[in-house]
Amino acid sequence: MGVNKALIKQAVKQILVAIGEDPEREGLRRTPDRVANMLEELTNGREENVQYTLFEGSSNMVIVAGIRFSTLCEHHLLPMLGVTHVAYIPSDKVIGVSKIPRIVVKYSRMLQLQERLTRQIMNEVSSATGSGDVMVLTEAYHTCMMIRGVRSASPLVSMAYKGKFNDSSLRLEFLEYIRPFRLNKFLT
């Protein structure tokens, strides 16, 4: 299901009028088009079909850390900006390293809750690799929390893990490895 850009443009014009703006003034004339194009780009994840190639691997933990992402909060349609860290223990094959960031992009290109995003990435990595041993940690600043309401710049951290990552020592090993790539160090 694609984006109905005509309907978005009409709705944006109505919102502009509702907040007391003139949608025909110079700075706003193309805003409905810009918003429609932006929403089309930021919500096309359901159409993303990541192709996986499996390669010979090992049984050692594979980690891709510091994958930057942005997504829209489904409650306020405002951005979340953050990083994702992914680990899995291959059963015997690995996927191409670029596929993990592609999985993150796929699920971040839709209206999201951070906790759901984290689980979706974990489940897709598990499915793509055939591994039941996966851990994902996402950290994000929610602009809906930063610019309205509580006005706090505190990041939200969410984790999803399964299989061997239920062992706290393996989780700690993962967390220790990704420390240099954590949000507070990575986005500054």
From Swiss-Prot:
SUPFAM superfamilies: Tetrahydrobiopterin biosynthesis enzymes-like (SSF55620). GO terms for cellular component: cytoplasm. InterPro entries: GTP-CH-I_C/QueF, GTP-CH-I_N, GTP_CycHdrlase_I, GTP_CycHdrlase_I_dom. The keyword GTP-binding applies. It catalyses: GTP + H2O = 7,8-dihydroneopterin 3'-triphosphate + formate + H(+). Zn(2+) binds at C73, H76, C144. One of its GO terms (molecular function) is GTP cyclohydrolase I activity. Pathway: Cofactor biosynthesis; 7,8-dihydroneopterin triphosphate biosynthesis; 7,8-dihydroneopterin triphosphate from GTP: step 1/1. It holds the Pfam family GTP_cyclohydroI. It is an enzyme of class 3 (hydrolase). GO terms for biological process: one-carbon metabolic process; tetrahydrobiopterin biosynthetic process; tetrahydrofolate biosynthetic process. Keywords: GTP-binding, Hydrolase, Metal-binding, Nucleotide-binding, One-carbon metabolism, Zinc. Its EC number is 3.5.4.16. Homomer. PANTHER family: GTP CYCLOHYDROLASE 1, GTP CYCLOHYDROLASE I. NCBIfam families: PRK09347.1-2, PRK09347.1-3. Belongs to the GTP cyclohydrolase I family. This is GTP cyclohydrolase 1.
